[in-house]
Amino acid sequence: MKQSINSLLGYTIKGTDGEIGKVEEFFFDDQTSTIRYVVIKTGGWFSEKKVLISPEAFQKLDCESKKLSVNLTQEKIKNSPDIETDKPVSEQQEELIRGYYSWPGYYGNGMYGHMGLGMWGYPLVEVRETEKEMIQRKTEKQANKNPHLRSTQEVTGYDIHTTDGNIGKVEDFIIDNVSWKIHFLIVETGNWFSGKKVIISPRWIKDVKWQEQIVTINHSKEEVKNSPEYDSSQPINDSYEHSLNDYYKK
């Protein structure tokens, strides 16, 4: 089922022996457009802190009661490694937390051993790096952060550029709540298209300038403007998704 990230904020996380806390934000992998962690703000049953939980621990999502059940106890969460979620999560921290919960690594061969085309404008593994890319990668490695783990909260508000100009800002994300992959970005167009909201797929992203907070897609303003109308009050079904893909000839 397709669901927006914003609709999941505030959901109660229910452990095997009681409530753990509330959903605050999500971290996604910008190479595969997959949710890697949900950030949970714990409740009053122990000193308040924020923790990361992987979809590996998810058991049941109940949209009626707005609860997400996980296969973890309160005690397990309480004793989890401390992670400063307001700072970039390092690879070492990921290894620590995944080891603590016995979650497998991702990307197939270890965390980063999977070849292919990334969703956000570059290959999964830089086979041929430019000098600038090499310097950036080494700098990020020295800073100990995972350069491909992004916060949905951080990316919300990024400018969306087409091949011929700006069309709006990222407002939300549409995910599949089974695979936990991001299928679409919701774009608030403001005055560009008379306030119309449009959705774009990560597959259409040509380039991302993270420092400038700009996402560029490989379609024109006119193409986006005339795309099948998106109704935010209705869930995205297969019929709409097919019509959208047919329109963009993807």
Name these PLM-found stretches.
Residues M1-K250:
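Peripheral interaction segments used for macromolecular assembly
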